[in-house]
Amino acid sequence: MLKTSITAFALLAMVSGCADVPQATEPAPASAPLKITSWNVEHLAERNGEGCRPRTDADYADLRRHADALAADVIALQEVESKAAAERVFDPARYDVVMSARPKGRRGGVCYGKPGQTIGHQAVGFAIRKGIRWTRNDDLSALALGNPDLRWGVDVTIGSRQPVRLLAVHLKSGCNSGRSQSDPDCPVLFDQLPVLERWIDGRAAAGETFLVLGDWNRRIAARGDVFYAEIDDNEPAGADLSIASEGQAAGCKARYREFIDHIVLGSKALTRMLPGSFEEYRYDQPEDRHPSDHCPVSIRIKP
């Protein structure tokens, strides 16, 4: 699909709810809606051949192609080894990259199902298009629960006239539904819940416009999800949350029809989201050649 302007691309996304790979476009002008994206880049390493998803120069070039086609203004990143790794995909001449300050963990070990490959550091961060005003707030280190192998949240504010607070997260994996006490992952995820809720409640109490986005490792849009119900309580006022996908089915992988990557908006942020602008980016490659095991998800908000 050819896109002749940012406006046309935005209108098409609002109608379709998903996006195939478009041609790369120029950044949006200051008055245009901002495209806010979350992308788990799957074990993105600094150097070729390392980590649980060892890559070649051609693989990094393919990721850059998709990053250009995505044409996002702000991208929350997950599973990125370092700033240097992110800058192999997001050109530092075009993007400011900020990564969590979490020290590299001691986890190491062999990648699951991949003998001889060693897991690398997984950090959360942002790539922010140059020209967008932003400030960094303290990382939400409490999400790690004192465990050096759990990820921190990264907290930035974009814009100045009508600022938006963004928290990028990558929550504990392995508890995508329910609350089984026999599953060792569920108690950890639910210990992260009050940390996340305190951040949300703090933003709502301060009257801020905020989003929480990233890899939640949880099907929070499922009917009656107990994790989401606990944070979506509208206490204090303004903490009434909305999930941007609005019940749409995921299409990145044939086996999985429910999202675990989410953009969650507070009530003030929802008023600035362009209706129908949620989209799941689709790679123009067979699933076994996808450059990551997650597809980016995006919305557009009024600046």
Regions found by a protein language model. Give the residues of each.
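Positively charged n-region of N-terminal signal peptides that target proteins for export
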Residues: M1-T4, D215
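Bacterial N-terminal signal peptides
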Residues: S5-S16
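N-terminal, active-site-proximal structural segment of metallo-dependent hydrolase catalytic domains
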Residues: C18-H121, P194-E197, D284-E287, D293, ...
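Metal-dependent phosphoester-hydrolase catalytic domains
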Residues: A19-P22, G146-P148, R198-L211, N217-P303
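Active-site beta-strand/loop signature of hydrolases that rely on acidic residues for catalysis
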Residues: I36-V41, H66-E87, A127, V156, ...
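Short acidic, glycine/proline-rich loop/turn micro-motifs
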Residues: R47-E50, S177-S182
